């Protein structure tokens, strides 16, 4: 329903602007002045009609860039007054470019069409946006991309998938030894139920674990399809979780974790994380706190339409007092119309 509303709104907006442009074109064609249509009538006093030279183009572009920078800084201050001031800063540069040569009603129509296309682009970005680039989780040399990497890809890369056999949980050391989990044979005997769901269980209680060379790395969740069950091999990875035990075991066996090239097994100081993730970082630990529960990073990769049209991704990294990772989660929300 959400998709239908947004797409319908954009279609109505596009039709309105198309009619507006067509109406203005017909007005310029039918309205006459001194025997000529406004479409062909000059609208300024300039008589030069040749194309702009390279030097002139550079001059006007420089003016536009300078005016645009000042206008952008003014807009960032917020407020209606600053919005009007930004337009007043930018308008003279635009008018200088417009009046550099003889212009007719045709030029005004071209400007209107350009503005309409720009306005539609702004509306598209505000309502739908563009798909975010999925973060890449790297374990040693193997890369995992949520909603793209399949269970079969993991197994081909040397990972083992374990399926939970009961309801109880086990200590980390016994997860693969006490029968709580059984190694998946890759025989298409396990299917992922239709629909999207993330797992909220702690690692020892998760439905699926994944391991490398007998070392449990964490829990993992899969998504097959919205309307049918899918065999595990063909299902996509949508969630990966590490806990303190699995992180320590990975370090002991020289297994590295990276998220978009950031080494997660190193000290994760705020400047380092900010430099690596920039706009994707939405929460950082407060400074000078002794409460270890507040030491965590929140990351997101999303568009303006949430997950209506594009997949979106989230990560939570918990730390100890030394800013070393103690818990990690990377999850995706698959694009769907709820």
Task: Locate predicted features.
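A cross-family detector of function-defining hotspots
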Residues: 2-4, 130, 156-250, 254-322, ...
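Membrane-embedded alpha-helical segments of integral membrane proteins
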Residues: 4-6, 12-16, 53-102
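N-terminal signal-anchor/start-transfer transmembrane helix
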Residues: 13-30
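Structural signal for the C-terminal ends of transmembrane alpha-helices
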Residues: 25-32, 97-104
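Membrane-interfacial, low-structure loops and terminal tails that flank and connect transmembrane helices
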Residues: 31-52
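Internal/C-terminal transmembrane anchor helices
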Residues: 104-130
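Alpha-helical transmembrane signal-anchor/signal-peptide segments
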Residues: 132-145
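Solvent-exposed, conformationally flexible loop/turn segments
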Residues: 146-149, 265-267
